[in-house]
Amino acid sequence: EVSVMPVKYIERLEQDLRKVNGSHRDTVCIDFCAGNDACVLTTMHAALRRQDISLVCGTGDAGKVSANGKIYEDAVAYALVRNQRGRVKTYKENIYQPMDEHRFIASKTDKKNYVLGELNGHSARQVYQDILKVTEKQILTQTFQNPFGKLNGDDTCIISIKEVQGNALVCFRQVNDSDVLVLLKLADYKEVVRDTIQKIRADFPRPSAVFSVNCLFRYKLFTEHGYMQEYLKEMSALGKHAGLVGYGEHYNDQFVNQSMTCVVFE
């Protein structure tokens, strides 16, 4: 019942945490969610943070998850993975940078349907078009280059545009009234990837495995730029690697778009 009351079964996660008896140094939570991601992550994080355990993974487009051979709708499936031979650490990669001259206050939002109505009191669609000089039809591909970012302290949560709805924009994650947003632009993504790999190597000279989630839009962007195979080759240098392409990425209590999240095992 994640769409209406994700907290209803939180005791199951609390019991599993006691059984695993892990810590932030050796345990990670990997989850797959069927919807209402932001609320689900906030709920799960309330239990995980007591032991400072990180969470990564994401969501797809089918609105279903599978666990132990059964398919569930309106649910979240998770696994608590404890590394018995070393540490674990999670990472989030952002290949965009803020356009500081384009900051906005969101309004006329529809939290349930992820609608962004206005930016600084003007049509969200028109503002986006005017700044980037694109047609309405081009908006859905321009978001690969220029998504929005929600400012969260020193961090930025990326927000992708899903579709145009009249003068509004429908996004892939929730936007609330009075949220502070900034328009983002594509950075030197090859350099960002190299920096991520260097950070992982510095933290884990001998990693045993990596599990990652890449956004579908990152996959499309890398493919269009002829970089996808090079990206996979560079990441494979870290060792054994498994992962998936998703519709939205999870990182602790954050539901983000157009990102890569991963967990590395020592």
Mark where each language-model region is.
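Hydrophobic alpha/beta core scaffold segments
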Residues: 1-266
